[in-house]
Amino acid sequence: MSVTSIMDDLKRRMHGAISAFKHELGGLRTGRASASLLEPLTVEAYGSVVHINQVANISVPEPRMLSVSVWDKTMVGAVERAIRDSGLGLNPITDGMNLRIPLPELNEERRKELVKIAHQYAEQARVATRHVRRDGMDNLKKLEKEGEIGQDEAHGLSEKVQKLTDETIADIDKILAVKESEIMHV
C-alpha cells in the first residue's frame, strides 16, 4: 500500500463519517418540516419491507407540514400506520391517497432530548474518525517497519493524519453546533 493510497483512504473514510453524521442528524426533528424525517421509516409492501419513499412521494408544502402522496391506494393504511407508530409523535390526516402530517411544536423537554441525541450522534462520528486515524497510523508504522518510508517521513505523515483528524472533528463540532441551535430555536 502506498502513502498516497493510505492518505486518500483516510480522507475518504473521514468524509464518510461526516456524511453518516449529517444523515443521522437529518432524521432528527427540528421545528421545521423536512422530508428526511420520514425517510428511515419502513412499511410492508408487496411481501417485503421497504422505505416509505419507495411507495410514496414525500414533500414539504408548508414549513410545519409534510405531505405524503402514496402511489398505490392499497398502501395508504400501511403508510399511515408506519408514520403513526414511528415514535415521532406525528398524526397523519388521510385525504384519499394523500397524507397530510402537521408537525406539532416541540416543547422544551423534547428539544433538550433531541440535543442529547445529536450529541450522541456527534460522539459516534468522532469515535469513527478516531478509528480511521488509528488505522492510518498503523498502516504508516507498517510501511516504516517494512522500510518503504523513513522515520522522518513517517513522523511528518503521522502529523498530517493527526491534522486531518482534528479538522474532521472540528467539522463535526461545527455541524453539531448548527443543528443544536436549529433544535433549540423556538
From Swiss-Prot:
Function: Responsible for the release of ribosomes from messenger RNA at the termination of protein biosynthesis. May increase the efficiency of translation by recycling ribosomes from one round of translation to another.
GO BP field: cytoplasmic translational termination
GO molecular function terms noted in the UniProt entry: ribosomal large subunit binding
Disulfide feature: none
Sorted UniProt keywords: Cytoplasm, Protein biosynthesis
CDD domains hit by this protein: RRF (cd00520)
Primary gene name: frr
UniProt keyword Protein biosynthesis present: yes
Domain of life: Bacteria
Database matches in InterPro entries: Ribosome_recyc_fac, Ribosome_recyc_fac_dom, RRF_sf
GO cellular component: cytosol
Family that this chain belongs to: Belongs to the RRF family.
Protein's name in the database: Ribosome-recycling factor
Subcellular location: Cytoplasm
UniProt main location, coarse: cytoplasm
Source organism of the structure: Bartonella henselae (strain ATCC 49882 / DSM 28221 / CCUG 30454 / Houston 1) (Rochalimaea henselae)
